């Protein structure tokens, strides 16, 4: 089984979405079940409704999953496994106060060294811990040897015992920590591959260590994706609007175009424009670059326009939420618009834009009055010829006011292109 494990603590960002897409693709390629595991153990930070929002986004992107589970439902399993390690002497009760630990951290900072747990409580026996009757956290004992694994993207990685350290697996209120819950759940659901961001690299040896001490011997593969940088070359954060999947969708980027771009980002692909189903056929995690990739909104706009151009007029009408027959108009405006939002603005201008211009006020009025009573011919050439004759206007004094009257704008596609698409609405829009 392959899993995508988001936390319901905020809006989904493009880094999360990329992880979801890659996990979905690998599940399809390997013919494995795709699990959504909502990691809701951080109760204080959970935001109500964010889990449903995440699932809705996955649906929007066509990432079909087989099951949804909540990590908090497995608390009893996490606790039992933690007490098992405690009873076997592979973990210990730690009574160190937050103040004591902070003092140790400050000391490490002064000495310019990485903080490591002092080991103060490591030799307290289970009997002694029980007799004290005080709250305690459970810490797993640090490994005795190097923890090594092969990352599909990063290659061979090794972590010394001190880097893994004796870390907390169960809080004083008996809730599991992130790493412990994650390691146990990957065992419970028989996860075979974990794809996630490289900010989790330091968590991986801890999770391997937990499973080793629990006697789990099934191999789990790992692939840690490099971070996505913003246009200034810094790590993308919530301050970057484009990092929010919700914002991208609201701006009129298509789910299929966003997916296309995220698969393309820092990857070797046989072509630039493709669908999710096409990517499943050739996608290979080994082709992902180890280096961070820079997010380029202009590149996304280019890809989005390509996907819009591939849509039929009917599909465009549905995506834009416009009346039947306006797909042809949308197709024409794709020469100068790259998103659904921009297309809607262009179409709205044609249908509802102000037909006013001080320079050509008289000409606009003349043309408007003629068009109200004129029977519109099929071809633009006939239309232009008849209107020129009836109005007595020509050149700039004809074409400029005609464009303003028909489109609500001084610039845009050729009127000969636009005419067939708006002919049936001309009398309506010039009012």
Swiss-Prot record:
| Any Gene Ontology biological process | glutamyl-tRNA aminoacylation
Protein localization: Cytoplasm
Question: Main EC class of this protein?
Answer: ligase
List the ranges annotated as motif 'HIGH' region: 6-16
Keyword annotations? Aminoacyl-tRNA synthetase, ATP-binding, Cytoplasm, Ligase, Nucleotide-binding, Protein biosynthesis
Binding locations of ATP:
238
The cellular component terms of Gene Ontology attached to this UniProt record, alphabetical and capped at eight, are: cytosol
Motif 'KMSKS' region: positions: 235-239
Recorded catalytic activity of this chain's protein: tRNA(Glu) + L-glutamate + ATP = L-glutamyl-tRNA(Glu) + AMP + diphosphate
Q: Name one GO molecular function term.
A: tRNA binding
Q: Could you tell me the superkingdom of the organism this chain comes from?
A: Bacteria
What Enzyme Commission number does this protein have?
A: 6.1.1.17
Q: SUPFAM superfamilies, per this entry? A: An anticodon-binding domain of class I aminoacyl-tRNA synthetases, Nucleotidylyl transferase
The family database entries (InterPro entries) matched by this protein are listed as:
aa-tRNA-synth_I_cd-bd, aa-tRNA-synth_I_codon-bd_sub2, aa-tRNA-synth_I_CS, aa_tRNA-synth_I_cd-bd_sf, Glu-tRNA-ligase_bac/mito, Glu/Gln-tRNA-synth, Glu/Gln-tRNA-synth_Ib_cat-dom, GluQ/Sye
Predominant location of this chain? Answer: cytoplasm
PANTHER family to which the protein is assigned, alphabetical: GLUTAMATE--TRNA LIGASE, GLUTAMATE--TRNA LIGASE, MITOCHONDRIAL-RELATED
Oligomer and partners: Monomer.
What the protein does comes down to: Catalyzes the attachment of glutamate to tRNA(Glu) in a two-step reaction: glutamate is first activated by ATP to form Glu-AMP and then transferred to the acceptor end of tRNA(Glu).
Q: Which family does it belong to?
A: Belongs to the class-I aminoacyl-tRNA synthetase family. Glutamate--tRNA ligase type 1 subfamily.
Quote the protein name from its UniProt record. Answer: Glutamate--tRNA ligase 1
């Amino acid at each position: 089984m392959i899993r995508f494990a988001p936390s319901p603590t905020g809006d989904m960002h493009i880094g999360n979405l990329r992880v979801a897409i890659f996990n979905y693709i690998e599940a399809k390629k390997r013919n494995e079940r795709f699990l959504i595991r909502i990691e809701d153990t951080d109760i204080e930070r959970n935001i109500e409704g964010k889990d449903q929002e995440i699932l809705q986004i996955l649906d929007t992107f066509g990432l079909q999953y087989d099951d949804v589970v909540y990590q908090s439902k497995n608390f009893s399993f996490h606790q039992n496994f933690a007490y098992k390690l405690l009873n076997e002497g592979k973990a210990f009760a730690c009574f160190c106060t937050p103040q004591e630990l902070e003092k140790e951290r400050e000391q490490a900072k002064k000495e310019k060294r990485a903080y490591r747990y002092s080991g103060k409580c490591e030799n307290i026996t289970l009997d002694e811990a029980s007799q004290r009757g005080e709250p305690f956290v459970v810490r797993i004992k640090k490994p005795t040897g190097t923890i090594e694994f092969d990352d599909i993207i990063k290659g061979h990685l090794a972590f010394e015992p001190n880097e893994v350290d004796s870390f907390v697996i169960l809080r004083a209120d008996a809730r599991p920590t992130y790493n412990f819950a994650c390691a146990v759940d990957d065992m419970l659901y028989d996860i075979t591959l974990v794809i996630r961001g490289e900010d989790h690299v330091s968590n991986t040896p801890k999770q391997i260590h937990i499973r080793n001490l629990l006697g789990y011997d099934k191999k789990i593969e790992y692939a840690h994706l490099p971070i996505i940088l913003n246009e200034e070359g810094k790590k993308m954060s919530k301050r970057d609007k484009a990092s929010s999947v919700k914002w991208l969708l609201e701006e009129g980027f298509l789910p299929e175009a966003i997916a296309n771009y995220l698969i393309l980002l820092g990857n070797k692909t046989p072509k630039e424009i493709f669908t999710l189903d096409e990517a499943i056929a050739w996608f290979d995690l080994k082709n992902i670059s180890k280096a961070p990739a820079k997010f380029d909104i202009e590149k996304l706009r280019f890809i989005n326009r390509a996907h819009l151009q591939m849509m039929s007029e009917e599909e465009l009408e549905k995506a834009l939420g416009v009346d039947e027959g306006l797909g042809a108009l949308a197709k024409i405006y794709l020469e100068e618009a790259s998103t659904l939002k921009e297309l809607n603005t262009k179409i709205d201008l044609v249908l509802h834009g102000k037909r006013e211009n001080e320079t050509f006020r008289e000409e606009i009025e003349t043309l408007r009055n003629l068009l109200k009573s004129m029977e519109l011919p099929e071809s633009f050439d006939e239309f232009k010829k008849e209107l020129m004759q009836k109005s007595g206007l020509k050149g700039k004094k004809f074409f400029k006011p005609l464009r303003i009257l028909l489109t609500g704008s001084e610039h845009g596609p050729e009127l000969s292109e636009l005419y067939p698409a708006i002919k049936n609405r001309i009398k309506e829009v010039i009012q």
